[in-house]
Amino acid sequence: VLLVRDIQGEGLEVFLIERAAKTNFGGAYVFPGGKVDLEDSSGRLSDMCQGVSDEDASSALGIDKGGLAYWVAVIRECFEEAGILLAYRKDGNNFDPEDEAENERFIEFRKRLNEGEPVLAEMCKSEELFLATDRLAYLAHWITPKVEKRRYDTRFFIAQAPEGQEAIHDGSESVNSIWIKPEDALKQFEEGKLLMIMPTIKNLEDICGYNNTKELLEDKNSINPYDIATIEPKFFMKDGKYVGLLPGEEGYDDH
């Protein structure tokens, strides 16, 4: 999930986490995220989602059913890896811990989720929350190239960070985190100061040039999801080095 927020003046920032050395893509700066868990598709959680049905979500992703689980997974992973919970209270207001006692309860819920406990539905029920699935914009679909030993089928989403919550990495799978303008992140990558992988780079390029998060989300939500193509890079050896190509680039269909 590309977690974004407005900055003073014009423009926006995106939240990046540095992967721990022991994990896949160790040392790289990536977006928070992970796999869809079994609980994400539970009926209990479906009833706790605001504004998006499984039919709508599945249609957007081009699958028969189960699409809403991706929206739920985005919110869960955002909470696990960034400490940001995209949710509404029962009165319709955005969730924001009211006091230290409530904040401590949610720190404990996050800890349990990071330990693998399927407690998202329990948390929503006990705290009377609804997941803000209507505040996500579906952005991109990437598949890991065939040369990789581990392959992933990944959907990317955009979400606006709510005011009043502070994003922070989990200290386990991620060891550092930054808020940074997408243009600055790309510049630091070019200068060798920030390690990033191709999907991160290309998705950052896709959110450059927007004046604020409202403009970004409105633009991405206006795109017909059927027009979001699946991107599967191809890598091949040239002069002793791997060269990567994307669909539509010259030479892609030759490999």
Segments the model singles out, each with a brief description of its role:
Residues 1-255:
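N-terminal leader/linker segments that precede catalytic domains of diphosphate-processing enzymes
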